[in-house]
C-alpha cells in the first residue's frame, strides 16, 4: 500500500506541476512580447508592419518600423515610428 500511495502522490504532483507550467507559459508569452517590443523600439528588430509584409496595416509590436499608412500598436517609449498606439 505504501508504494501505491507514493505513486498516487507523485501523479498528483505531476498534475499540479503541469498546470503551473501552463501559467508560466502564459507569463513567458507576455515577457517575450515585451522583449520583442523593446528590440523594435531600439531599432534593432524588424516589426511585423515593416516593408517585408508589403505595408500591411499591422505596424508591428511597437509600430516603430512600419510604413506611414500603418495603424499598428505603438509603444509609448518608441521613437521614429508611425504606429499611433500607446502599448504593445
Curated annotation (Swiss-Prot):
One matching Pfam family is Coiled
Q: Where is this region: Disordered?
A: 1-25, 45-88
Q: What is this protein called?
A: HssA/B-like protein 64
**BP GO annotations:** sorocarp development
> Which stretches does UniProt call biased (Gly residues)?
56-66
Q: Where is composition skewed (Low complexity) in this entry?
A: 1-24
Q: Which InterPro entries match?
A: HssA/B-like_chaperone, HssA/B-related
Protein family: Belongs to the hssA/B family.
Domain of life from the UniProt record: Eukaryota
Q: Which PANTHER family match?
A: HSSA/B-LIKE PROTEIN 1-RELATED-RELATED, HSSA_B-LIKE PROTEIN 1-RELATED
